[in-house]
């Protein structure tokens, strides 16, 4: 099947379940790879579309995806009167569950619905099935909960035949993405295949975090190394897991992108 550049109308059938914002290269016909971006908890696709435009990867079509469900106003500290108003705060989980230990939202709320929509419909049904791309043409980038989703989808891809809702299109998925970047997001246990004889996932991954990361501690890194063939870790000097704030923090991400764009 010949490859063609996706158009906005290719994704309209996903609405309102899934909404995307697309950022094309300056010359769309130069597109050779696709970057799919997942924002963090409580954000929206708009900010990550802007991020993609700012980094301006050559020959890369960026698709920033909106979280699958809105956050309740109460969790955002907003008055109940805003409950019926349009929101710009979304999340990726199947549910919103508070930890009994910390009172914070559980980092692994289950991602079955996001997996079905993003991997089953956006990636296989549209990018692969309709437009003729391969999974090794596709990079993933996520922050926080979105980073966990990026790692989880990369983990699940090694068992493509078992994926939830992956039924659209008539082309099979490959077993690895071109690469995946997670900032501050851990690999969700719910997205690790259950087979004890499973092979390691083939997607090269880069995880970036602060020195006092809440989720990407030594155990989380060990888990990644058990589940993926190629894991790179960047520990920033800053304490938290916020998005890159300067050239020094962004440099390893850009180097990873450059390497992966040269691959295959």
PLM segments and residue spans:
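Intrinsically disordered, low-complexity domain-flanking/linker segments in eukaryotic proteins
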Residues: 78-84, 159-173, 199
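Short beta-strand immediately N-terminal to the catalytic nucleophile in serine-hydrolase-like folds
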Residues: 139-142, 183
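Active-site signature of alpha/beta-hydrolase-fold catalytic machinery across serine-
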Residues: 50, 152-156
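The feature captures the conserved acid-bearing segment of alpha/beta-hydrolase catalytic domains
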Residues: 26-27, 166-264
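Gly/Ala-rich beta-loop-alpha elbow adjacent to hydrolase catalytic centers
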Residues: 142-146, 150
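Serine-hydrolase catalytic machinery in alpha/beta-hydrolase-like enzymes
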Residues: 2-135
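Active-site catalytic microenvironments for nucleophilic, acid-base chemistry
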Residues: 54, 156-160
